[in-house]
């Protein structure tokens, strides 16, 4: 790789990391190319980005964004994206499927370095869509209850009329 290519990679990663909500560093030692491509495909479907990059170049890009505590050693694949819960879920699920060859090392979430256990904890949180559904349910509950109260007298009246009809028929 020439110096200018390295500078382009650092510039690209610096910009990407600046816009990312979270970054995860994973060890992929022993993974086949098809498994790594599978990770890339899954990540792309979820709006995440995956890149295997030299540690020194990634460290420069991270430091350009003020991330000092992030240490890269051995083989690393970096995964990043805008939705930290989706990122954590994707990486955790992939790590469970490929236990022998893929391990979560660390992450950078909300301005701090996170270990694998913290990333796994994030993966158990509800997704943005699930949270919106819960919020919508909370907002609509009072309206549903009000409609039920308004409809109750009508339903009771119909029930009383039905009972009277049945008594007269008997």
From Swiss-Prot:
Keyword Flavoprotein: no
GO annotation, biological process: translation
One Pfam family from the record: Ribosomal_L10
GO molecular function: large ribosomal subunit rRNA binding; structural constituent of ribosome
Gene3D superfamilies: 3.30.70.1730, 6.10.250.290
Keywords, in A-Z order: Ribonucleoprotein, Ribosomal protein, RNA-binding, rRNA-binding
A single Gene Ontology CC term: large ribosomal subunit
Matching SUPFAM superfamilies: Ribosomal protein L10-like (SSF160369)
InterPro entries: Ribosomal_uL10 (IPR001790), Ribosomal_uL10-like_sf (IPR043141), Ribosomal_uL10_bac (IPR022973), Ribosomal_uL10_bac_type (IPR047865), Ribosomal_uL10_CS_bac (IPR002363)
Highest taxon of the lineage: Bacteria
UniProt keyword Methyltransferase present: no
Function: Forms part of the ribosomal stalk, playing a central role in the interaction of the ribosome with GTP-bound translation factors.
Family: Belongs to the universal ribosomal protein uL10 family.
Subunit-structure text: Part of the ribosomal stalk of the 50S ribosomal subunit. The N-terminus interacts with L11 and the large rRNA to form the base of the stalk. The C-terminus forms an elongated spine to which L12 dimers bind in a sequential fashion forming a multimeric L10(L12)X complex.
Stated name of the protein: Large ribosomal subunit protein uL10
Organism: Nitratiruptor sp. (strain SB155-2)
Organism classification: Bacteria, Pseudomonadati, Campylobacterota, Epsilonproteobacteria, Nautiliales
């Amino acid at each position: 790789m020439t110096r200018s290519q390295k500078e382009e990679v650092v510039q690209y990663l610096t910009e990407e990391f600046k816009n990312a909500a979270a970054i995860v560093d994973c060890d992929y030692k022993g993974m086949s190319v098809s498994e790594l491509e599978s990770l890339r495909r899954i990540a792309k479907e979820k709006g995440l980005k995956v890149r295997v990059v030299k540690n020194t170049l990634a460290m420069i890009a991270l430091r350009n964004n003020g991330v000092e505590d992030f240490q890269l050693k051995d083989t690393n694949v970096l995964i990043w994206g805008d939705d930290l819960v989706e990122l954590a879920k994707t990486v955790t699920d992939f790590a469970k499927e490929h236990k022998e060859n893929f391990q979560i090392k660390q992450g950078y979430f909300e301005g701090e370095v996170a270990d694998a256990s913290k990333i796994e904890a994030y993966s158990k949180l509800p997704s943005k869509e699930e949270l919106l559904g819960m919020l919508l349910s909370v907002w609509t509950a009072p309206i549903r209850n009000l409609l039920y109260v308004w409809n109750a007298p009508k339903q009771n009246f119909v029930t009383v009329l039905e009972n009277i009809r049945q008594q007269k028929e008997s």
